[in-house]
UniProtKB/Swiss-Prot annotation:
Biased composition (Polar residues): 233-249, 715-753
Residues bearing PTM Phosphotyrosine: Y226, Y332, Y347, Y460, Y470, Y508
Tissue: Widely expressed. Higher expression in lung, intestine and testis.
Protein's name according to its UniProt entry: Breast cancer anti-estrogen resistance protein 1
Listed Pfam families: CAS_C, Serine_rich, SH3_1
UniProtKB keywords: Acetylation, Cell adhesion, Cell junction, Cell projection, Cytoplasm, Phosphoprotein, SH3 domain, SH3-binding
GO cellular component: actin cytoskeleton; axon; cytoplasm; focal adhesion; lamellipodium; membrane; plasma membrane; ruffle
Biased segments, Basic and acidic residues type: 514-524
Region described as Substrate for kinases: spans on this chain: 213-514
Main location: other
Example of a GO biological process term: neurotrophin TRK receptor signaling pathway
CDD domains for this protein: FAT-like_BCAR1_C (cd11569), Serine_rich_BCAR1 (cd11552), SH3_BCAR1 (cd12001)
Modified residues (Phosphothreonine): T367
Amino acid sequence: MKYLVSVGAGPARRAGGLEDVSWGPRVSRRPQSYRAARHVNESLPRSAFRVPAAHGASVTPSAALGSGLPETQPEAVCRGTEKPRFAEGCKPAASRDKNVLAKALYDNVAESPDELSFRKGDIMTVLERDTQGLDGWWLCSLHGRQGIVPGNRLKILVGMYDKKPAAPGPGPPATPPQPQPSLPQGVHTPVPPASQYSPMLPTAYQPQPDNVYLVPTPSKTQQGLYQAPGPNPQFQSPPAKQTSTFSKQTPHHSFPSPATDLYQVPPGPGSPAQDIYQVPPSAGTGHDIYQVPPSLDTRSWEGTKPPAKVVVPTRVGQGYVYEASQAEQDEYDTPRHLLAPGSQDIYDVPPVRGLLPNQYGQEVYDTPPMAVKGPNGRDPLLDVYDVPPSVEKGLPPSNHHSVYDVPPSVSKDVPDGPLLREETYDVPPAFAKPKPFDPTRHPLILAAPPPDSPPAEDVYDVPPPAPDLYDVPPGLRRPGPGTLYDVPRERVLPPEVADGSVIDDGVYAVPPPAEREAPTDGKRLSASSTGSTRSSQSASSLEVVVPGREPLELEVAVETLARLQQGVSTTVAHLLDLVGSASGPGGWRSTSEPQEPPVQDLKAAVAAVHGAVHELLEFARSAVSSATHTSDRTLHAKLSRQLQKMEDVYQTLVVHGQVLDSGRGGPGFTLDDLDRLVACSRAVPEDAKQLASFLHGNASLLFRRTKAPGPGPEGSSSLHLNPTDKASSIQSRPLPSPPKFTSQDSPDGQYENSEGGWMEDYDYVHLQGKEEFEKTQKELLEKGNIVRQGKGQLELQQLKQFERLEQEVSRPIDHDLANWTPAQPLVPGRTGGLGPSDRQLLLFYLEQCEANLTTLTDAVDAFFTAVATNQPPKIFVAHSKFVILSAHKLVFIGDTLSRQAKAADVRSKVTHYSNLLCDLLRGIVATTKAAALQYPSPSAAQDMVDRVKELGHSTQQFRRVLGQLAAA
């Protein structure tokens, strides 16, 4: 009887149960399944079945397929101990030096055990096209698995090859182990690479009954056909009688049964190390496996994380240059060894890794972390590779050492004996014991190493970060984003308020200037506990600021305002907590039996809210009285409207509080009254925040600055300096400042017209609607807004610089050429040079250009200072406007020269540089808008700084061109 060898999957034919398959865009016929081997008779001799397993050969008796089928080529059949050969047209994938790569164009779901499943976009290695004579079916490898795929669903990537020879794959996942001729025990023949790896199987996986077919059990005389090694200490021979189960390939993975013959044929000791595919793919890529965590491996974060600080150029002469070292030091706040890793820093992470002083610098750490957390009793040397715990648990203890063969190329770096436990993978011995994973003790989560150096076995046993040595209030242990002063609730209890005691300076973290207001707190608490009406409140002894008295200093006022706002938020939060706890488990509102509410606690909490809101109102009233003396006439009306809203809220609180006070828990007090009081109190913190924000935004106008205002004559003389020139200048625009402009000296028409005209030209921060935008722009130009930024105040030098820039930028350009006298008499130029009129024009505007360049340089310096000190948008936007207006004067000079000069050369060059300056100004406007909208984005601010630096260089070129033209 003859036997037909079907290598891979033969052509689909209608014989012996094979069927034609028609399936969409694929090839017309589906290849014959490898599962025909289930029909093999057990009594057939095994000596004629030597077909390499790399191509998933299956053996089928010719009688089973029908007598009409032709026999295979003689060379495809191996007899006796003849060397295995492939059928004609089949070439082993491992014999190729390079394999072409292909990309999946469509999804593919495997419909037979020998077919690969893949998704659209997957990249796979094409081992052989039209494999085994199957037209349109390719033998491919994907994720360590081999199988056939429809070629019309792949696209060959031209010029792209697999960097290394085809990785030995598991072959067709459902192929049963191939019998081998009997050999003496201990003798191992080379095995094709594809048969040396089988997918690892989780213990939980159990094949379904319909997915399992059995391979006939060999008799005792046929045991040698399986080529199982003998009593080699590294391998276990399968028993004489055993049953191997195999499952169909699923769309994702194919898993064999967890039997003792988990691997089809264990590799022999003489097999090449590079052909052993028992290492996870990530372990063979070299020394870059676990150098640093992925979040730290990308040195520059590739744009996902901007630099921590903006690099500002330094001024050198009249230009600006970047310092190379400055950018390297300030751009990233990372340890130096992470910026320049060397060969000795292969696994160079911060000291929290627990590195010991005597450890090697060149150790690689090729083991995934889960390998060091193996089962109990395992020898650590066998944990070099990532063994899934589920597979290990399913194996007998005697097989632990025979599962994986360690390639010499990897194991040569592994120290022997106890050195592995101490130094190889930086894992303390304590980690060898199974422990539940604690994220807080993970080496990459720890923020800093413990202060003391613990023993080696306690590397990760970090003591608690905050031992309770002191009685710290819980509020101090839970810092939140909104806790400005972090008030412990247990220290703001209402009984202290009722007693009239003064809150100590430890409750609010107020700087020393605000501590002078402590007696005021006592008066506030004692006066507010009476629950009096509005008339009595105005006559109380609260002394925040009394109208008619000198306003508070700016710093003290800002600090007091923040303290008052925080007091309102804290007292309301306490009231809401008190009422909320009543509805909780065990509360007096949660039980069916009526209980008496804690009236005294509720009254004290309501009184505290009244007092906090009342004190904020008194502070706001004093600010309203100060608003009548500011340069902005609309400020008083706006602040009055904000104050009136807060007054209405306070009156509502007083009414509900009086109901609670008069009821005293009797018939006059109901739970509905309490609910209405709580509902009214919920909106109080937001109203107080709006009022405080408005006061803070105009604090520089409402309160006295730290720098005492100059004497009267100085202020008045600076105001009346060339008023006609200011009014007629093209650069005239309001820069209101409290010491200068008053209601008598600034006509309404001039202020409004010039402000609107400036808005038309430089409105580039569109954050609100038109009206809101114009109001914001006007505030940006006020010196008070600049003063109140930067955490309370700017330095005195910056304030003087801002005032000087106001005057310089507002100074108009001189157009009167008739009254101009050159510093040196005009010398006639060379023949064919400029005419006298053009030379005079160039010299005149060259002087104007140099004067304005000084102003521009000062404005750029101030702008860079604001950016370098991380000032908020309202500061650097105002400084950028000084830069823009100063540079715009140079554009005006160039435009005038291009229109009045007679020489074509002068007109062309001046026009070119004027257009260049205009383009740079547009770029500065756009980048400044982006930096303001994206604040505090360092990348956006850096782009803005770069544009201003380019503007400085271009203005210097413009001046040099004017000088060259004038000297021609």
